[in-house]
Amino acid sequence: MWELVALLLLTLAYLFWPKRRCPGAKYPKSLLSLPLVGSLPFLPRHGHMHNNFFKLQKKYGPIYSVRMGTKTTVIVGHHQLAKEVLIKKGKDFSGRPQVTTLDILSNNRKGIAFADYGAHWQLHRRLAMATFALFKDGDQKLEKIICQEISTLCDMLATHNGQTIDISFPVFVAITNVISLICFNISYKNGDPELKIVHNYNEGIIDSLGKESLVDLFPWLKVFPNKTLEKLKRHVKTRNDLLTKIFENYKEKFHSDSITNMLDVLMQAKMNSDNGNAGPDQDSELLSDNHILTTIGDIFGAGVETTTSVVKWIVAFLLHNPQVKKKLYEEIDQNVGFSRTPTISDRNRLLLLEATIREVLRIRPVAPMLIPHKANVDSSIGEFAVDKGTHVIINLWALHHNEKEWHQPDQFMPERFLNPAGTQLISPSLSYLPFGAGPRSCIGEILARQELFLIMAWLLQRFDLEVPDDGQLPSLEGNPKVVFLIDSFKVKIKVRQAWREAQAEGST
């Protein structure tokens, strides 16, 4: 009996022990690992994973590998190596690993964010990029859409003058409407039941993905009851049902001679493909309703929670750093005033604000670890071999907190992005990739940067953002899920006296 058990264990150890494709090649240093469970017993059990991986660099260097279950994962924590993965060898490493929870979220690896490299991903990314080109000029100009929603946001916040509130939901509404207008040309009024549905499923999905699930490391575990997995499936179904409803209603009013949003772009591509008017890379099978809905879901999901979270981080850091906030008020008062609202062109004048946004994206990156990549071919990173199928994680936290690259990296210092005179924005380090880079870079970077700048410029022009009367400051610890979230906090909103006086003068 025991001999049989021992034989079975030896067989499993042989089957699951990592095998090198190139026996003579030099591979990254590796944590200890065991058959089946890999390096899991040897990883730190407390603290955030991105920080734990960063600490391991002191022992293993800026590139090392771990066995996550039965899969080899290479951790990259230096900007030169990261750029080799993302840019120089971007095609080699543009794949996505197959992960149980992400398969559910992406309707079995459709869409853009979690789809593997291939014709489908290339097509949908290209069509999404084409959508953003629609919003460069005219009535559909991106800036105009953003400012319309920010104006509504400011009007709503003004009704809470002198009150202490959580700004999460109001900011969520504004950003959701911007994305919704880009995706299918509709916006929601505050109190719309669909808006609550979007908010609830969004929170549910992020919460589910934030729980480190063993089923992602051991997919065979999905045959057993799993509350987190069931919760994720439930919220994804709610999302899919809502998007399907919007899609079906939209089909009735679609006109191929009026392309104004992402759904139009995708539907036109599908129609052209069905009619044989598309190129060879535009297979109609890759433009099924399910493919289209997943791509819309990707843009809708990724574009909302990320920007909402960064806005809250900015406000939180300003509450902790009143001297920076004071300088921002002075900068806006001197360069914009109160006779007009801020515009994107003010970026050249509101340098400290732009530097503040950049610093927040450094010190609290949207994703401390980028979505895992996968090697499509046998390749290398630096001097080390990387086998086909290897998972690669860029530890953005390590890049943004490297003491050799950043002076006092754990300190909030917007001035690091300005020259000594404060008259010019600078790039103090190459170790800065807040939106990733290369083929898998964030396609919504331009949108996100515009939203962050305009939202903060408008808020600071109109409102004093103050610590609540109870003195409770936001926690800056954060909660890294699929997005680096900040714990809920409240801020005291007061309409600025200078703004009120300017408005009173303008109305007389």
UniProtKB/Swiss-Prot annotation:
Q: What is the activity regulation entry?
A: Regulated predominantly by intracellular cAMP levels. The 17,20-lyase activity is stimulated by cytochrome b5, which acts as an allosteric effector increasing the Vmax of the lyase activity.
Positions annotated to bind heme: C442
Q: Between which residues do disulfide bridges form? A: none
- UniProt key word Cell cycle: no
Q: Which terms under GO biological process does the entry name?
A: glucocorticoid biosynthetic process; hormone biosynthetic process; progesterone metabolic process; steroid metabolic process
Provide the Gene Ontology terms for cellular component.
Answer: endoplasmic reticulum membrane
* InterPro entries per UniProt: Cyt_P450, Cyt_P450_CS, Cyt_P450_E_grp-I, Cyt_P450_sf
Report the locations given in the UniProt record.
Endoplasmic reticulum membrane; Microsome membrane
Q: Which UniProt keyword terms apply here?
A: Endoplasmic reticulum, Heme, Iron, Lipid metabolism, Lyase, Membrane, Metal-binding, Microsome, Monooxygenase, Oxidoreductase, Steroidogenesis
Reactions catalysed, semicolon-separated, are: a C21-steroid + reduced [NADPH--hemoprotein reductase] + O2 = a 17alpha-hydroxy-C21-steroid + oxidized [NADPH--hemoprotein reductase] + H2O + H(+); progesterone + reduced [NADPH--hemoprotein reductase] + O2 = 17alpha-hydroxyprogesterone + oxidized [NADPH--hemoprotein reductase] + H2O + H(+); pregnenolone + reduced [NADPH--hemoprotein reductase] + O2 = 17alpha-hydroxypregnenolone + oxidized [NADPH--hemoprotein reductase] + H2O + H(+); 17alpha-hydroxyprogesterone + reduced [NADPH--hemoprotein reductase] + O2 = androst-4-ene-3,17-dione + acetate + oxidized [NADPH--hemoprotein reductase] + H2O + 2 H(+)
Q: Name one GO molecular function term.
A: steroid 17-alpha-monooxygenase activity
The metabolic or biological pathway listed in the UniProt record of this protein is:
Steroid hormone biosynthesis; Steroid biosynthesis; glucocorticoid biosynthesis
Q: Does the record carry Chloroplast as a key word?
A: no
UniProt xrefs under Pfam families:
p450
Protein function: A cytochrome P450 monooxygenase involved in corticoid and androgen biosynthesis. Catalyzes 17-alpha hydroxylation of C21 steroids, which is common for both pathways. A second oxidative step, required only for androgen synthesis, involves an acyl-carbon cleavage. The 17-alpha hydroxy intermediates, as part of adrenal glucocorticoids biosynthesis pathway, are precursors of cortisol.
**Protein name, please?**
Steroid 17-alpha-hydroxylase/17,20 lyase
Kindly list the organism's lineage.
Eukaryota, Metazoa, Chordata, Craniata, Vertebrata
Give the gene name. CYP17A1
